[in-house]
Amino acid sequence: MRTATIKRQTKETQIEVSLNLDQQSGIQIDTGVGYFDHMLNLLAKHGRFGLVVKATGDLEVDAHHTVEDTGIVLGETLKEALGDKVQIERYGDAMVPMDETLAQVVVDLSGRSYLVFDAELTNPRLGSFETEVTEDFFQALAFAAEMNLHARVLYGRNTHHKIEALFKATGRALRQAVTINPAIEGVNSTKGVI
């Protein structure tokens, strides 16, 4: 099974993430940021991953450090769980509607870090979650996992729906990309390594 657990501690946050790519063995999310917990739960559910996230941070300041550092640790955990990437599909693409909103996420588990984020999030706050940190989360995730991640909202009105559709689409795109395909010889690259 492709699993990994990584812990990270700084003066601002203490985070532990356990990820199981092959079995939805349970989802337990506790970051202290309710809306963010909900989004991570959706990512895991729609990616069909087992995911445990335990995070504490300087929420008396704001949620930024907790959200961004969780993205870093989740990305590192994904990278470790993938191992040598032999026979993975590598690419994933998902479009997800959420009422009036349509979001698309495309990933490439290429070993090259890059984020394109195109979403207008007009409501600055959802509970204790500052919506501008959504992009920071995806940036941290993409760079720590060493993947290309293109996330965009094609249209929509409600900020909650936009972010929710992005997290669901990320889960679905990652599910495609991490899927093992026995027809692939070695890694899915002409270079022989990703």
UniProtKB/Swiss-Prot annotation:
Reactions listed under catalytic activity: D-erythro-1-(imidazol-4-yl)glycerol 3-phosphate = 3-(imidazol-4-yl)-2-oxopropyl phosphate + H2O
Cell compartments where the protein resides: Cytoplasm
GO biological process: L-histidine biosynthetic process
GO molecular function: imidazoleglycerol-phosphate dehydratase activity
Assigned EC number: 4.2.1.19
Pathway, per record: Amino-acid biosynthesis; L-histidine biosynthesis; L-histidine from 5-phospho-alpha-D-ribose 1-diphosphate: step 6/9
UniProt key word Ion transport: no
Keywords associated with the record: Amino-acid biosynthesis, Cytoplasm, Histidine biosynthesis, Lyase
Primary localization: cytoplasm
Any single Gene Ontology cellular-component annotation: cytoplasm
Family: Belongs to the imidazoleglycerol-phosphate dehydratase family.
Listed NCBIfam families: PRK00951.1-2, PRK00951.2-1, PRK00951.2-4
Name the record gives this protein: Imidazoleglycerol-phosphate dehydratase
Taxonomic source organism: Limosilactobacillus fermentum (strain NBRC 3956 / LMG 18251)
